[in-house]
Amino acid sequence: MLVLGIESSCDETGLALYDTERGLLAHALHSQIAMHREYGGVVPELASRDHIRRALPLLEEVMERAGTAAGDIDAIAYTQGPGLAGALLVGASVANALAMAWDKPTIGIHHLEGHLLSPLLVDEPPPFPFVALLVSGGHTQLMRVTDVGVYETLGETLDDAAGEAFDKTAKLLGLGYPGGPEVSRMAEFGTPGAVVLPRPMLHSGDLDFSFSGLKTAVLTHAKKLGGANICEQAKADLARGFVDAAVEVLAAKSLAALKKTGLNRLVVAGGVGANRQLREALSAAAKKRNFYVHYPDLSLCTDNGAMIALAGALRLQRWPDQSGKDYAFTVKPRWDLTSLAR
C-alpha cells in the first residue's frame, strides 16, 4: 500500500510517500522559520498562505524522487488536527482535491499520533508496547502506547509545554527565533552549576509536568543579572541552568513512567526530542538502568509529512473502513489524542 502524507498543522509544509512494503520512499519539507523570524513567532495567516504556495511544488518533488505516478498511490493521509485552523484547512483541501481528481480515498490523521509513530520509521523500529515522551512546542505528555490507536495518557503538562518554555526563555535572554535551538546552543557555553534553577514537580509523586515556574525563575534571575544588559557569559550560564533543569525533569518523569508501567522501552518524539542534552541524558539512563530508548531521525523530529503518511498506512492496514471518497472534511484544531482508541 502506497500512501501520500500531507502535513500542514503549523509552520512546516511536509509531503511524503510511504509504502508498507518498501518503507519511506521520499519526503520533502519546507520550513517557514525565516518568514516568521521577524515577528518572533508564527503568524497564522502568513502560515496558511505559505502552505498554499508550497504544497504542489513539494508534491511534484516527492513524486519525482520516488519515481511514482498518481496511479500508483492507494490513499492520501492528511493532518486533520490539532493545529492552526487555517493551516489545517489548506492541507485538508489539497488532500481532498487531489483525492477527488485521482479517485483516491482519504484519511484524516491526528498530528500527535504521527509524532508518536515517527520512531517506527527507523531501520529497527521499536515493538509495541512502549512508553512515549511526546515533547514539543505545544505538547508535553507521557503516553502508554499499546498499539496503533491505543493510547493512555500517563502524565502531561499542567501549564506550559516544554518547547514553549524553551522559546520563552530564548525571548527573555534576547536570543533568536526559533528559541529552542538557540537556548540549547547558548547552553553549550554555560558553566555547569553556575546557575541552579528549580526542578518543578520533580518530586510530585505523579507523572505530570509544570514549566511555567521554571520560566519565571529564568526571568527573575535575568533581572538580577542586569536584565537587558546581561553579559553573554551570564546568558550562557542561565541558559545552561534552564536546560539542565528541564532535561532533568523530563528524564526523571520518563523513568518514573517506565517503572509505573513495567515497560522497558521508551520512545521520544516531537521537536524537543531533537535536543542533544535530552538525548544524552536518556541514553545514559538507558545504559545504567537497562532499558531501551528510541528516537526518530533528527530530520523527522520536526513536523513532517513522513509521519502522517506512516500513520495513515498503519491505520488503513488495520481499519480499511477509516478511509473514504466522500471528500467532505472537517479539521480539528483541538483534538484529544486518547479519543482515537480504535
Swiss-Prot record:
Cofactors demanded by this protein: Fe(2+)
Assigned EC number: 2.3.1.234
Origin superkingdom: Bacteria
UniProt keyword Acyltransferase present: yes
A GO biological process held by the record: tRNA threonylcarbamoyladenosine modification
Cofactor note: Binds 1 Fe(2+) ion per subunit.
UniProt: substrate binding residues: 134-138, 167, 180, 275
Pfam families the record matches: TsaD (PF00814)
Cross-referenced InterPro entries: ATPase_NBD, Gcp-like_dom, KAE1/TsaD, TsaD
Catalytic activity annotation: L-threonylcarbamoyladenylate + adenosine(37) in tRNA = N(6)-L-threonylcarbamoyladenosine(37) in tRNA + AMP + H(+)
Keyword Transmembrane annotated: no
Molecular function terms from GO: iron ion binding; N(6)-L-threonylcarbamoyladenine synthase activity
Residues holding Fe cation: 111, 115, 303
GO cellular component: cytoplasm
HAMAP family cross-referenced by the UniProt entry: TsaD (MF_01445)
Role of this protein: Required for the formation of a threonylcarbamoyl group on adenosine at position 37 (t(6)A37) in tRNAs that read codons beginning with adenine. Is involved in the transfer of the threonylcarbamoyl moiety of threonylcarbamoyl-AMP (TC-AMP) to the N6 group of A37, together with TsaE and TsaB. TsaD likely plays a direct catalytic role in this reaction.
Protein name: tRNA N6-adenosine threonylcarbamoyltransferase
